[in-house]
């Protein structure tokens, strides 16, 4: 048989954090930055609703969800687009803006899907160097050419946990050419409580050359339902709607997201839990000479440079005990580091107890 020829991509496929380990039960997955507290009780109630019309197509425009987003975040309904996870928003932006001769700038250590979607449409990905794992505005500006169309930044950044301040983001937008679209990923903004931080949406909701993307996969706990959203100028959102799949966000995801937005108590509890537990984990690890970033999201980047064991050794030892962390060598190319998701109180205690036992 002859297989018709298809395009060949010179890309490294995204590798999600492991979920299973052969022959081991009671696994703790601390590799994917998922919600430590699960989902809101309001969401659970929706998921138990037997009247869901799953035989019918969902609202393709996600009107009710967009209205709820508009209400909660005080932004224009017409400037909102919903996607099957924020991944799909990233994909649509790349499809809309990039062609093979174009360039997109992404920080050296950043969410892998920025580069993957850009490469799929044939654009050249240009990496800006980071300083001490922090995005550098000067390094981004150095990489700008006439071919630059997009700049992607996650703030706080995944997997490093560092962030740009309010003043730094404003400075970056001023220094970039006006015809370059700045895409700010607010995936972890709910966890960030530093006074010098401001979310991309709060800073640029009325700008014509900024698109902000957000997700329901992290603090809202809807990772499996795949729902995210973007906010930008009406012209850009209208153009994205032309290439958006007609029923891209399913009915259950839309209804769950609406209820998740309404539950302030769950969000507040999640933030408090994260700060308390992350600091507890940091303090325990410091005694083992494992350093990490300050708490800016629901994960920590663990640094083993001063530790008597390597990151790879600890990764394998923990895995043999049923605890999965994220290696930063795969895809990110960050040596001797591990990314740790902040889990439930019980999960974090087991992690601390297990890693202490490895050292003893």
From Swiss-Prot:
Subunit structure: Homodimer.
Keywords: Amino-acid biosynthesis, Aminotransferase, Histidine biosynthesis, Pyridoxal phosphate, Transferase
Name of the protein in its database record: Histidinol-phosphate aminotransferase
Catalytic activity: L-histidinol phosphate + 2-oxoglutarate = 3-(imidazol-4-yl)-2-oxopropyl phosphate + L-glutamate
Enzyme class: transferase
Record organism: Pelagibacter ubique (strain HTCC1062)
PANTHER family: HISTIDINOL-PHOSPHATE AMINOTRANSFERASE, HISTIDINOL-PHOSPHATE AMINOTRANSFERASE 2
Gene Ontology BP terms: L-histidine biosynthetic process
Pathway: Amino-acid biosynthesis; L-histidine biosynthesis; L-histidine from 5-phospho-alpha-D-ribose 1-diphosphate: step 7/9
Entry superkingdom: Bacteria
Family to which this protein belongs: Belongs to the class-II pyridoxal-phosphate-dependent aminotransferase family. Histidinol-phosphate aminotransferase subfamily.
